[in-house]
Amino acid sequence: MNDVSKASLPKAIFLMGPTASGKTALAIALRKVLPVELISVDSALIYRGMDIGTAKPNADELKAAPHRLLDIRDPSQAYSAADFRRDALAQMAEITAAGRIPLLVGGTMLYFKALLEGLSPLPSADPEVRSRIEQQAAELGWEALHQQLQKIDPVAAARIHPNDPQRLSRALEVFFISGKTLTELTQTSGDALPYQVHQFAIAPASRELLHQRIELRFHQMLASGFEAEVRALFARGDLHTDLPSIRCVGYRQMWSYIEGEISYDEMVYRGVCATRQLAKRQMTWLRGWEGVRWLDSENPDRARKEVLQVVGAIAD
């Protein structure tokens, strides 16, 4: 697409970043001064009843700046990147038709990629192949399968944690079915996003600062009643650790504590470590992201002004 035709497209803003980087606060501040409507891009915030551990915006924040695509699934339900793309495009069209600008905010980079580039023609799931992978995992462990993926598709392996069996088995399954790696196939995208997108990423200047923010927020969640929230989910009886919702960072570790598998202190340690690992994967995505402008989360006022400098002209 040439620059002239691209300039004629409706405008959209991406505000991306690792967990605990201040994305939500910046998005809310921007909504006060720009004609934008917020769309959440977060695979955990979609779930009802999962508020504290996901750092979901509170009632006052949502009143000041409503977020779309929050609380749209029960924790027992699945939600894919394809589901997100469909829902986000519908919301973006509605916002644009009302003469406003969609501001998509979150840290689920796979969703941003699916929205921006379209979805790749990946092979359908094969129960027989998946069963063989799971049998191999039972015999050798998921760490061994992750090492196998590193040899087959090092790019995908860098983004998939060894403790994420769903994504790990899918990456291997795609290769065994098609003979092509997940990375190869995802480079062949579907329909690109029909918007002129201004992309921003917000993060602290150093990894140490991000780690401090992560640890502080995890302890704030605990003080706010995170354990009671997960106990309520546990008491339902229909949820388990094979579900994407319960595998969310923090929830998986608290679940293990409630089941008596680990101590409270171990839960806290693992929860903080898992959140740091998530942030590392998010930063890996973002460092390779084209066309993104970086903002410093330690200076939110300056970050807001930098966005306004770029976006102010398109909002007039």
Swiss-Prot record:
EC numbers on record: 2.5.1.75
Pfam families xrefs: IPPT (PF01715)
SUPFAM superfamilies hit by this protein: P-loop containing nucleoside triphosphate hydrolases
Residues binding ATP, per UniProt: 17-24
UniProt cofactor(s): Mg(2+)
One term of GO molecular function: ATP binding
Keywords: ATP-binding, Magnesium, Nucleotide-binding, Transferase, tRNA processing
Subunit structure: Monomer.
Similarity remark: Belongs to the IPP transferase family.
Name by which UniProt lists this protein: tRNA dimethylallyltransferase
Purpose: Catalyzes the transfer of a dimethylallyl group onto the adenine at position 37 in tRNAs that read codons beginning with uridine, leading to the formation of N6-(dimethylallyl)adenosine (i(6)A).
Cystine bridges: none
Source organism: Salmonella agona (strain SL483)
Reactions catalysed according to its record: adenosine(37) in tRNA + dimethylallyl diphosphate = N(6)-dimethylallyladenosine(37) in tRNA + diphosphate
Binding positions for substrate per the UniProt entry: 19-24
